[in-house]
A protein has these predicted regions:
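Helix-terminus/linker motif at the lipid-water interface of multi-pass membrane proteins
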Residues: 40-73, 91-92, 129-140, 196, ...
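Short runs within selected transmembrane alpha-helices of multi-pass transporters and secretion channels
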Residues: 1, 79-82, 153-172, 178-190, ...
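Transmembrane alpha-helix boundary and packing residues in multipass membrane permease domains
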Residues: 35, 39, 47, 51, ...
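Small-residue-rich hydrophobic transmembrane alpha-helices
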Residues: 63-121, 125-127, 160-174, 178-182
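Alpha-helical membrane-inserting segments
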Residues: 41, 45, 49, 53, ...
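Hydrophobic faces of transmembrane alpha-helices in multi-pass small-molecule transporters and flippases
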Residues: 17-48, 52-53, 69, 73, ...
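Residue-level signal for transmembrane alpha-helical positions in Major Facilitator Superfamily
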Residues: 33, 41, 45, 69, ...
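Short alpha-helical transmembrane segments in multi-pass integral membrane proteins
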Residues: 1-33, 89-155, 197-231
Length: 231
C-alpha cells in the first residue's frame, strides 16, 4: 500500500472514486434483461419440443436424450466461436477500429464454418458409436431413432455455426434485441413444426424443424447485418 501510494497513487481506490454511473447501470441492466429473456425463450422452447418427443414413447425419449447430449458437445464449439467474436468486436468497436470489427466477423465466420463442417462430418459418420456411449447396445430401436436424428440434423449444422457467429457479432455491437428476436423466432418455429410433423415423421421431424429454424434465424441475421453494414 505504501509503495503504491508513493509510486503509483493513481492505482489506489479512494472514496471519491466510488460512485454510481447511472447511464452505465441502465445499459448493463438492459443488456442483462434481454440476455435473460433470450436464454429463457430458448429453454422454454426446448421444453415444448420435449413435450412433442414424449409422444414417441420410451425409445424416442431415450434416443432424443442421448442425441441432445451429443449435440450439446458439438454446439459448444460454435458457442465458443461466437463468444470469441463478441469479445473481438466489442473491443475493436470501443477502440474505434471499425475495419477490424468487420475482419473479426469475417475470420470468425470462416473459423466457425471450418469447425462446423468438421463437426457435421464427425456427427454423420460417428453417430452410432457416439450414441452407444449413452444407449445400451440391445436398445436397437432407440439407436435407430437416434442415428436418423443425428445424421439428419448434422446436414444443417453449418447454419447453426453461422448463426452463432452472427450472434457473437451483434452482441459485441450491443444489438441485443436482434440476437433475442433471432433466437426466439428459431425456437418458436422449431417447437411449432416439431409438434405438427412428429406424428408422421417421428424424431426426424425435430431434426428438420431445428434445421429450418436455424435457416430462418441466419436469414434474419444476415438481412440485419447487411442493413447495418450499408448504413
Amino acid at each position: 500500500f505504501l509503495y503504491l501510494r508513493d509510486t503509483y497513487p493513481g492505482l489506489l481506490c479512494r472514496r471519491e472514486d466510488i460512485g454510481a454511473h447511472k447511464d452505465l447501470m441502465i445499459h448493463t441492466l438492459r443488456y442483462g434483461l434481454i440476455s435473460a429473456l433470450q436464454a429463457s425463450s430458448l429453454y422454454i422452447g426446448k421444453i415444448l419440443v420435449q413435450g412433442s418427443v414424449n409422444t414417441l414413447g420410451t425409445p424416442g425419449i431415450a434416443a432424443y436424450t442421448a442425441a441432445t447430449r451429443i449435440e450439446g458437445f458439438a454446439n459448444s464449439f460454435g458457442d465458443s466461436g461466437g463468444s470469441a467474436i463478441s469479445v473481438m468486436v466489442s473491443q475493436n468497436l470501443g477502440a474505434g477500429n471499425h475495419d477490424r470489427v468487420k475482419k473479426s466477423l469475417k475470420w470468425g465466420m470462416l473459423l466457425n464454418w471450418t469447425v462446423g463442417i468438421i463437426v457435421s462430418l464427425l456427427m454423420f459418420i460417428g453417430s452410432d458409436q457416439a450414441l452407444r456411449l449413452f444407449l445400451g447396445s440391445s436398445d436397437e430401436l432407440a439407436l435407430h431413432y437416434g442415428n436418423g436424428y443425428i445424421r439428419l440434423i448434422s446436414l444443417f449444422y453449418i447454419f447453426c455455426f453461422t448463426g452463432s457467429a452472427y450472434m457473437g457479432y451483434f452482441k459485441g455491437r450491443g444489438h441485443m434485441l436482434l440476437a433475442f428476436f433471432g433466437t426466439t423466432g428459431h425456437i418458436l418455429l422449431r417447437a411449432a413444426l416439431s409438434a405438427l410433423w412428429i406424428g408422421k415423421m417421428g424424431l426426424s421431424a425435430v431434426a428438420v424443424a431445428t434445421g429450418i429454424g436455424w435457416m430462418l434465424c441466419v436469414t434474419y441475421l444476415t438481412i440485419n447485418y447487411v442493413r447495418i453494414y450499408l448504413t
